[in-house]
Regions:
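A conserved segment at the C-terminal end of the G1
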Residues: 91-107, 116
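Switch II of P-loop NTPase G domains
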Residues: 10-17, 64-82, 102, 113-120, ...
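C-terminal-of-GTPase-core extension/linker across diverse P-loop GTPases
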Residues: 17-82, 87, 92, 98, ...
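Short, charge-rich amphipathic alpha-helices with coiled-coil/heptad character
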Residues: 1-4, 30
């Protein structure tokens, strides 16, 4: 039986697809359950929504690290300008890479399955930080039941491989297959500016399919005579079309390319505000995505300001200096905005 979903439900589902904060996602799921038409054609979807509400509620109610009964968090609340998940097979060097990029003290060892729980860390880039979350290795020999749930808050993924290991060819396909079975697709498509990364395209039919834009990170090239040639051969044999870099977590080779590349392809826009007659506050920018608007900036400052906003003046690439613009004016990275209510 066709689902015959209503416009109200579709709007709620679209908002859920874009949500990254776990509590926002939980509220979105509850709204989806409230607005979904109740008939046999939606029975399966209703059951899926109820199951996810239960799982996410239990995770959010679970005492966290340091609590009397709790353990490490399985879902990491996003921080910084974006959340990037580190994914890969055993012994690919994810934890060493994470430690190099973030300065974290996450355990790293030359044996598999060192990482047992999500390990967050912050990678600085210019005047912002990107949150990198090291996840347990993906392998059929060591299933991680909560892995797909942990990925729901991510904006993108780093798929880490050991370029020196001939087994990487089969391991990467196993990683992709396991994730697909859990309705997570590592895609080579990075959305155009203004579109949220990590969101299933509307029209997929399944609101719970997650498509994570992915950068392939070919690690351990310190052991190769020509890492770039090996990477080209690896991509040709596997048929993968991911954007890719060669790096060495051991020596630091190539690591400086990752932050700038992620920043440019995530479409991040740093926006600064100013009061009339005063210089802009450049200490801490508001973080948006290119294509978001002046109204979105006002909402980040205060929800009441978003409602009362009359116009703004803007300095930057999205307009000439001091130009008066309306609430729907799109912002660009580096814009300075003066909000008037």
């Amino acid at each position: 039986m066709p689902a015959n979903l209503t416009p109200e439900y579709k709007a709620v589902e679209a908002a859920f697809r874009k949500a990254r904060d776990p509590r926002e996602r939980l509220e979105g799921l509850r709204e989806m359950l409230r607005t979904i038409p109740k008939h046999k054609g939606t029975d399966h979807l209703q059951g899926d929504i109820k199951r996810r509400i239960k799982e996410l509620s239990e995770e959010l109610d679970r005492p966290q690290r340091g609590g009397a009964r709790g353990g490490p968090a399985l879902v990491i609340r996003p921080e910084g300008a974006a959340q990037i998940a580190l994914i890969g097979p055993p012994n690919a060097g994810k934890s060493s890479l994470h430690a190099r990029l973030t300065g974290s003290a996450a355990p790293a060892a030359p044996y598999p399955f060192t990482t047992q729980y999500p390990e967050p860390g912050m990678m600085p880039h210019e005047n912002i930080s990107l949150q990198l979350v090291d996840l347990p290795a993906v392998s059929p020999e060591h299933p991680v039941p909560w892995l797909a749930s942990a990925l729901q808050t991510a904006d993108a993924a780093l798929l880490v491989v050991d370029l020196c290991d001939p087994a990487s060819l089969e391991q990467i396909e196993a990683v992709r297959t396991i994730l697909r079975e859990r309705r997570v697709t590592l895609t080579d498509r990075w959305e155009p500016a203004g579109e949220s990364p990590g969101v299933a395209a509307e029209g997929d039919g399944d609101p719970f399919v997650l498509r994570l834009p992915t950068l392939l990170v070919a690690n351990k090239v310190e052991g190769l005579a020509d890492g770039d040639a090996e990477l080209r051969a690896f991509l040709e044999v596997t048929g993968l079309r991911y954007p890719a870099f060669t790096v060495s977590a051991a020596t630091g080779q190539g690591l400086g390319n990752i932050g700038p590349w992620l920043f440019s392809h995530l479409g991040i826009a740093r926006v600064y505000t100013k009061a009339p007659g005063r210089p802009p506050d450049r200490g801490r920018p508001f973080i948006l995505h290119r294509g978001q608007t002046v109204e979105d900036v006002a909402r980040l400052v205060h929800t009441d300001l978003a409602r009362s906003l009359r116009y703004a003046r803007i300095w930057g690439t999205s307009g000439f200096d001091g130009q008066q613009v309306g609430r729907e004016h799109p912002v660009e990275d580096g814009d300075v905005i003066e909000l008037h209510s």
